[in-house]
Amino acid sequence: MTIEIPPTQGVLLAGGLARRMGGGDKPMRTIGGSTILERVIARLKPQCDGIILNANGDPGRFAMFGLTVVADNVPDFPGPLAGILAALDWTATNRPGVEWVLSAAADCPFLPRDLVMRLHQGRAEEKAQLAVAVSGEQSHPVIGLWHVGLREELRRALVKDDIRKIDRWTACYRLAAVSWPTEPLDPFFNANTVEDIAEAERLAALDGG
């Protein structure tokens, strides 16, 4: 099935506290001479109609990347759903006419070059309201497509229902799960630990650098 890809705003989620690396910003770690964040931006820029960064704290630390930084608008670091909500709110205000937001973890350096196209294709084929990425048998709910029209429902889920896990919220909707192969590498590998950074250096060669 071939569809026309609608305008899609990208958001890179970097709001986590990076406890497994002793604090700090995981996307600022370097792989093969480039930061992880540079790699993610380069991979998604051709696929999205603009990219913003969801991060908390001083936005100036990301100034070199030239992205608009949007903080959570729900307090106490409630997780990636808060970053997705912030992106939906920002898109509704600043990108009238754009109905879809792609979210991706800012510490996934090998994202697929067909991510946006295949997620849209999957949700269109299944007439779904949302779409998430899968590799092997592992779901990656942080990496998905979200309709701007669901933002008030998401806000209620976060603020009134205290829902924190993406899977718990998406269970309320028709969801398309779109799968990618894990060979020669898992495109949704993310750098959570110092050991993961070393593994990412090896995988970068398989990904073309």
UniProtKB/Swiss-Prot annotation:
Source organism of the structure: Nitrobacter hamburgensis (strain DSM 10229 / NCIMB 13809 / X14)
Protein name: Molybdenum cofactor guanylyltransferase
Main location: cytoplasm
Leading EC class: transferase
Reaction(s) this enzyme catalyzes, per UniProt: Mo-molybdopterin + GTP + H(+) = Mo-molybdopterin guanine dinucleotide + diphosphate
InterPro entries: MobA-like_NTP_Trfase, Molybde_CF_guanTrfase, Nucleotide-diphossugar_trans
A single GO BP: bis(molybdopterin guanine dinucleotide)molybdenum biosynthetic process
Cofactor dependence: Mg(2+)
Quaternary data: Monomer.
